[in-house]
């Protein structure tokens, strides 16, 4: 006997069938590059590769962004307190086409540029906050698990526009998300997850109920290189010992110092 009750057995059987169908499909692999471009000049490049399918368990790997990457205007390397920095409206839609402008002098913004070979019609990108909780829009109960993302980012992530959270076709587009210093911890962490809906899944924008009908493709982020131009590195007080970072799982990754005249050429952005 299989040792499961009937419901568990049928659930496992359905899960195995989804995995089999997924692995035999043409888009069973993901290869995605995500570029984080800070407005202070810091650029980080993430390469994602993976084919692991998980149903019912949305695992994730979190990446830590040291707070010294974003010193304030006084050179302090801690998150500021209350002030104009966290007021809403710093992120503005530019025609609703996936392009967003950053407010002048906003050092905490990150630009997401999504590239790669992936079936975006069947794939979603999901964010996690510093504490590892799943970020959702306010109308999905997100107020309790916002975990440091700026309210103004809701226009990007929820269903008001072409959003990151439910985006169907992200390849080649860029999006902005910003930490809100009102909520962010002093050592912010943000997580990313790429997952794939089961073909025919219903209520894809519904949160919890949708997850019961999803075979999740988890593409664990693997750091390749974080590109930082030399001028920014000096200005932002990078020390040699700080040029090797680790993911939350302890995996080291390299930070390369790139002269400004080779910056675009070497980073490809």
Swiss-Prot record:
Protein role: Major component of the virus occlusion bodies, which are large proteinaceous structures (polyhedra), that protect the virus from the outside environment for extended periods until they are ingested by insect larvae.
Protein name per the record: Polyhedrin
Native source species: Euxoa scandens cypovirus
Taxonomic placement: Viruses, Riboviria, Orthornavirae, Duplornaviricota, Resentoviricetes
Keywords: Viral occlusion body
Annotated GO CC locations: viral occlusion body
């Amino acid at each position: 006997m299989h040792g499961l009750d009937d419901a568990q057995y049928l659930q496992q059987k359905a899960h195995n069938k989804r995995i089999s169908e997924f692995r035999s499909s043409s888009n069973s692999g993901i290869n995605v590059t995500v570029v984080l471009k800070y407005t202070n000049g810091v650029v980080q490049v993430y390469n994602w590769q993976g084919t692991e399918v998980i149903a019912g368990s949305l695992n994730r790997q979190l990446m830590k962004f040291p707070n010294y990457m974003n010193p304030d205007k006084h050179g302090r390397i801690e998150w500021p307190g209350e002030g104009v920095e966290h007021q809403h409206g710093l992120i503005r839609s530019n025609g609703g086409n996936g392009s967003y402008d950053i407010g002048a002098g906003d050092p905490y913004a990150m630009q997401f540029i999504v590239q790669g070979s992936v079936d975006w019609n069947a794939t979603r990108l999901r964010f996690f906050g510093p504490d590892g909780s799943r970020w959702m829009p306010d109308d999905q109960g997100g107020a309790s698990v916002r975990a440091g993302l700026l309210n103004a980012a809701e226009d990007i992530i929820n269903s008001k526009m072409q959003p990151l959270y439910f985006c169907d076709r992200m390849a080649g587009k860029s999006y902005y998300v910003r930490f809100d210093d009102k909520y962010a911890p002093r050592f912010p962490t943000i997580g990313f997850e790429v997952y794939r809906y089961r073909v025919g899944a219903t209520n894809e924008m519904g949160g919890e109920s949708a997850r019961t009908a999803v075979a999740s493709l988890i593409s664990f982020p693997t750091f390749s290189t974080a590109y930082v131009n030399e001028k920014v590195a000096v200005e932002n007080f990078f020390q040699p010992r700080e040029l090797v970072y680790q993911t939350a799982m302890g995996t080291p990754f390299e930070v390369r110092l790139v002269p400004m005249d080779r910056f675009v050429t070497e980073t490809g952005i």
